[in-house]
């Protein structure tokens, strides 16, 4: 199977991020600001310090290729409670695990710092996996990638094989037992107000999936 969720003409992808989401809750203590010395704990300032403890150069705007990142995408708070939401992304499984561990390590740092003053954990970090790199499931069935590549070449389309800096439904399907690489659909500027797709690119995508169907009917496959 294939998903049609790629960008420019020729894109063919069978690697994607390992992904997790984190929700971090910061607890504070509110008192009159005029008499707050040594008493007030401002949860918003602790959240800010937490963000500053994340690697500065490992954000979406500072990374590319196979580089992973932390992405803070939501922050809402008051003195007594602040909730921060971020996503964690990495292609490498070991580095992915290290990133998740770092979230808990930073949380524990602040819990230790405020233990005497607050009396309980001041930072509560919840990290949940979202999806995984499909490469592990697709490579043993690499012929499905080769088939799509052959289809493109027969249509004079230059295959652009590269990692997806995101995820697709194909990642979930791959881990459900249906290896599912991704083929271009022509979209550009995803997740922004300038997102668009040329009709000509969609037409090329249709030609590719028709050619894949034709080749499937006439090709003998050896999964091994």
Language-model-detected regions and their locations in the chain:
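Fold-level recognition of mixed alpha/beta catalytic cores in primary-metabolism enzymes, strongest
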Residues: 1-43
């Amino acid at each position: 199977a294939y998903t049609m969720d790629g960008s420019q003409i020729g894109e063919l992808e069978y690697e994607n991020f390992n992904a997790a989401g984190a929700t971090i809750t910061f607890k504070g203590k509110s008192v009159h600001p005029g008499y707050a010395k040594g008493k007030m704990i401002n949860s918003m300032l602790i959240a800010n310090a937490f963000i500053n403890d994340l690697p500065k150069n490992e954000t979406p705007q500072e990374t590319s290729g196979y580089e992973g990142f932390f992405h803070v995408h939501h922050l809402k708070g008051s003195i007594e409670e602040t909730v921060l939401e971020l996503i964690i992304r990495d292609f490498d499984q070991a580095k992915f695990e290290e990133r998740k561990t770092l979230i808990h390590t930073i949380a524990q740092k602040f819990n230790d710092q405020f233990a005497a003053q607050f009396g309980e954990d001041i930072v509560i970090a919840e990290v949940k996996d979202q999806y995984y790199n499909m490469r592990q499931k697709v490579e043993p069935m690499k012929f499905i990638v080769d088939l799509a590549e052959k289809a493109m070449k027969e249509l004079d389309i230059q295959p652009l094989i590269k990692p997806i800096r995101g995820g697709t439904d194909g990642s979930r399907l791959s881990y459900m037992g249906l290896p599912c690489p991704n083929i271009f659909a022509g979209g550009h500027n995803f997740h922004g107000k300038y997102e668009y797709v040329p009709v000509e690119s969609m037409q090329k995508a249709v030609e590719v999936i028709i050619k894949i169907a034709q080749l499937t009917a006439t090709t003998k496959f050896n999964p091994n």
